[in-house]
Curated annotation (Swiss-Prot):
Family matches, as InterPro entries: Exonuc_VII_S (IPR003761), Exonuc_VII_ssu_sf (IPR037004)
Major subcellular location class: cytoplasm
EC number, as in UniProt: 3.1.11.6
GO cellular component, one term: exodeoxyribonuclease VII complex
Catalytic reaction annotation: Exonucleolytic cleavage in either 5'- to 3'- or 3'- to 5'-direction to yield nucleoside 5'-phosphates
Subunit relationships: Heterooligomer composed of large and small subunits.
Name assigned to this protein: Exodeoxyribonuclease 7 small subunit
Key word Zinc present: no
Pfam families, alphabetized: Exonuc_VII_S (PF02609)
Family: Belongs to the XseB family.
Biological source species: Rhizobium leguminosarum bv. trifolii (strain WSM2304)
């Protein structure tokens, strides 16, 4: 896939971003990529990593913990981190 054909990082789902990031890591670990291309795909990898971190953070903020009363029955929800 050429650079112009690669989708914008911000438009990728978490799963697609992780898959592309894993592909980049594999290519860099093989060591058979030219220096200029290595730098280019490394920079895309950094952008993918940041995008994944942002998506994970947003997902964590949406997760809620169920509160139970003394009898163990659901009473409501609260943020997972207790905030």
């Amino acid at each position: 896939m050429t650079d112009s054909a690669k989708p914008e990082v911000s438009g990728l789902s978490f799963e697609k971003a992780v898959a592309e990031l894993e592909s980049i890591v594999a290519r860099l670990e093989r060591g058979d990529v030219a220096l200029d291309e290595s730098i280019e795909i490394y920079e895309r990898g950094e952008a993918l990593k940041k995008h994944c971190e942002t998506l994970l953070s947003a997902a964590e903020n949406r997760i809620e913990k169920i509160r139970l009363d003394r009898a163990g029955k659901p009473q409501g929800v609260e943020p997972l981190d207790g905030a």
